[in-house]
Amino acid sequence: MGKVDDNKKLKMNTLLQTAFDLFTGKGFAKTTVSDIVNQAGLAKGTFYLYFKDKYDLRDKLIAYKACQLFDDAHKQLEETEINSLEEEILFLTDYIIDRFQKQQSLLKFLSKNLSWGVFQDAVGTGSVVSRQFYDHYRNSLVKYNVNCENPDLLLFTLIELISSTSYNCILHEKPVSMEEYKPYLHKSLKKVYEVFVLSLIHI
């Protein structure tokens, strides 16, 4: 049973990665289901076991790639000495931006789709990756004794701010380059954090 599940997961991941390569290289509109299965070396029937059509695949791929990004960021965070939730937020921001700068195809694909909606859907559907990231965030609120009235709204604001501002700064250096903009982004994130965090709980 384990081998069967592993094989299914392998096939789905192969389809997702192949689709990502084609969507970012050839373009979504010009890519067909036949293109995807042929390059993946799988039968068309296998495709329809996992996805309704290429639009369904694209939506799942956005969540899949976003989850990978959150998972990698979480792993890096676990290896770093951090002393506050605010420091965690800035560390994760820099990690995500650095990945986008190195993998601009990922940035172009996710574009403004790295949103709260995608993240929330992934968590809600039981994605282990997103769940771990989200649970870590909620645990950090407790760990650092942070009193936040609406943690989900804080996370939503942070994700939306980072994703909406990084695209043009990285790809087009407009209105300025990402390196020039980053200090202002950090200050903005700190202010957002201050607005949502009511006070520290002293134990």
Description of each model-found segment:
Residues 4, 10-14, 18:
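N-terminal positioning helix adjacent to the helix-turn-helix/winged-helix DNA-binding module
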Residues 11, 54, 65-69, 92, ...:
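Hydrophobic/aromatic residues within well-ordered alpha-helical segments
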Residues 14, 22-56, 60:
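Helix-turn-helix
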Residues 60, 75-102, 155-158:
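Hydrophobic alpha-helical connector segments
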Residues 67, 71, 118-145, 152-156, ...:
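Amphipathic alpha-helical packing segments from all-alpha helical-bundle domains
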Residues 98-135, 171:
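Short secondary-structure transition hinges
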Residues 148-171, 180-192:
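Hydrophobic alpha-helical segments that form the core
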Residues 201-203:
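Conserved small/polar residues in nucleotide/adenosyl-binding loops
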